[in-house]
């Protein structure tokens, strides 16, 4: 970034553009504001004067490019006239914060509103995920002589510090807000108006959500008004917020008055108008263009969304207006599932982000352009944007009338000004290309201006962008200061198209050159335009794709192959809904596997050791892809640390090998061992155990030259597990945590002495599997029995409630944590030990029945099961027992307790005991027309996996006090973060392998359906091990199998809780394509 004016007062620093726009605000390395801004963006930190005229309110920003700006060593001044007001604002800095001295004159009633966005964490943390950091900022509001004061504390430690800021005023504050959604409103995407600033009063409520922004409202002034807003920052506030700091007036009086030196005022070459929003589309247009609509979603008689026969998802603008989480899509090219590290991916958003975060391979590093940092489209330079220029006014294309997306393309339809403008972004199958095309249906000529914020790395502004322009073609290279250069030196992106001119920010204003990282492509007026970018990771660019329509068919067909040609038929619409789900969740499994990132969680790029061992592995297990499973096993084991036998929590699976998180939770070491048993049972590939693969050197984070057989890797890991058993037991130490990341121990004493009952159950299951399939099975059988014996001794000997944790301090009596007798946490029940102990067959029938009684009574809610019977106690964000569970100020994601991954494991446990409600439980977490199943479900995007179902409590205190409303279904539940999760893969695994019960071993097909009787006659097509199978499920008094009209002799598999699965030897299938009727037992439940 260039041209910044930095003001520094000891540890506090702020950077401005000469025209007065704030770039960033820091206390040491703590970024106080949320986004590093450029002068072309709407400013998040702002002061508005609001004219109250009758019933209407007119709002005017004071800190704008129209102001006359001056600087001195203490701050910046803004002066000017806006609407009916004359104003001056002086921003003064001191060593701990800032003051805004505001004076406004105007012949009417008005008030002032100050907006301050917050990052309140180390810069790298804030820029990794603004929404995540917002979830951990606690707001504390006090009311005193000057009205309301808002304190904000970062509850997640930043290098052992808890930064805080106090925002207030020296005059009366009568209203406030704590989250940007309470100011802008979801409709901002369509109107560009801050909806709640048009209301007489701010909401004056603490809303702990994902857009950290404090807003303050003054009392009304008549004709003349003065106020002083302030921000007072603290580097470390270990305790929860309490009484506010009072000596602000004294601090203010110590700032010396100095004249301001006038600064350069940026002169815009073009007027930037309000964005274009598509008009409401007509029913006749929809009927003509989308006559066949599947799973229509309606509200109050209006159509909101639907799917096409080809499974594309189509959304109306009216739905987008209501969502906090904007409609988005992660587009993929045709993924090479054996070599996923070169996948081309891009993110699109309905609100007019046509191509953002375009990556070739690594989603953090090999990134061509920037990603969206705000869900409301307030920041409009991210990624690739398109303006229409009319009479020297530039208008951005925003929310369309209709948006359509598939797995490799998105299309925006703008009904506007008597025309239909179509924008389409398409990724090609194999040639690493992205096309953006614009077309006018009426043949109208438009002058288009396309902006692209180039990063050639993780973040905008971080690295130099190196490019070469020749004959209108722009080629982008890794620069000398880029980490790409030594890892993927051949990486390039090449751009061409029908543009006439390539320029930069000077197209908007010459003073903005170098401020935003924009390339600006100007097109001559035409009724169509094309923009094309191609990536390469090796020496040569691929041959370009010519036929995009044929390309789309190739990619669509690849999903049929990926899902083993899976298809359901039934007279009800449930089959149709699940066919759609299989298609979209297969795509989202591929995102998790091949291009790890999400819509909200835009950073990623790595495989979590436990995550890849679940979502992708279980998907490929369910669909029978032995080659990918084998490669996955060897890849995961090659990342094992040679000295400890453990794994990193996560690692990059491409050439950025050294980037990984060394410390891992106590269960992580178990997952690679678990997949060994699963793979060997399915494949019979005992030869894999003799494959020689490297380790990772924990110091250098590189592969070792020395190799060990897979079996040696396995044995090393098992030795490590044994070494970590609590003294005198076969119970694994909790270490840094288990699957529930929010329950990491808060101190070293807990870490040392805790045992997770869930990890113990998983370990037992894994040892049992190894005993069945490894050469020295007796050893693992003995280990399993020892684990089972100690589980019974310590966990269930004197109670019928499995505790969430055991506290086992040497020399003291064992203590149950998360248990009805636990008076420390006051949490009674924990879900995942109850489900995993059944899945693993660790507990007997009586205990299994008790587990499900507990779940039904205490953990099951209308939108699914919750992780605990009560939330962890929250007291301002200070940890006592657990880290994030007691730190998160937002009641969402795992902290909100309905984490969908765990609900899917509940489905697995239901299938284990033969409970036919498993099918309904699949429906409860399906986003397609979810309100038909969960009446209190809030609207959400219908084609994306949501990782949690979040009860719409404003903050943790309301959640604690009113948690019973979740069970009642009397509070709305919102969809959480989307797409990036192991959830889509395990959902499809449970659908196919547990609920439909279709599994295989090396020499047999296994059928174990757990279906309600209303699905009698359900048909399923699937291809396993080169056998195309046409299956029909029929309920019966006894289970049996009929193949091509002939009843088969079958055996039952083992199941501790009920009659086991039907086993059909593959040798009995005499024809390649078989018609198989599975008669499933009506009453086969524990």
Swiss-Prot record:
Keyword Glycosyltransferase annotated: yes
Pfam families the record matches: Glyco_hydro_36 (PF17167), SOGP_2nd (PF21250), SOGP_4th (PF21270), SOGP_N (PF21958)
EC numbers, comma separated: 2.4.1.333
GO terms, molecular function: glycosyltransferase activity
Keyword set includes Translocase: no
GO process annotations (BP): carbohydrate metabolic process
Reactions listed under catalytic activity: [(1->2)-beta-D-glucosyl](n) + phosphate = [(1->2)-beta-D-glucosyl](n-1) + alpha-D-glucose 1-phosphate
Active-site residues, Swiss-Prot/TrEMBL: 741 (proton donor)
Keywords on record: Glycosyltransferase, Transferase
Temperature-dependent activity: Optimum temperature is 37-45 degrees Celsius.
pH dependence statement: Optimum pH is 7.5-8.0.
Top-level taxon of the source organism: Bacteria
SUPFAM superfamilies assigned to the protein according to its UniProt record, in alphabetical order: Six-hairpin glycosidases
Record-stated family: Belongs to the glycosyl hydrolase 94 family.
Biological role stated in the UniProt entry: Catalyzes the reversible phosphorolysis of beta-(1->2)-D-glucans. The minimum length of the substrate for the phosphorolytic reaction is 3 D-glucose units.
PANTHER family with a match to the protein in the record: CELLOBIONIC ACID PHOSPHORYLASE, CELLOBIONIC ACID PHOSPHORYLASE-RELATED
Subunit description: Monomer.
Name of the featured protein: 1,2-beta-oligoglucan phosphorylase
Protein species of origin: Listeria innocua serovar 6a (strain ATCC BAA-680 / CLIP 11262)
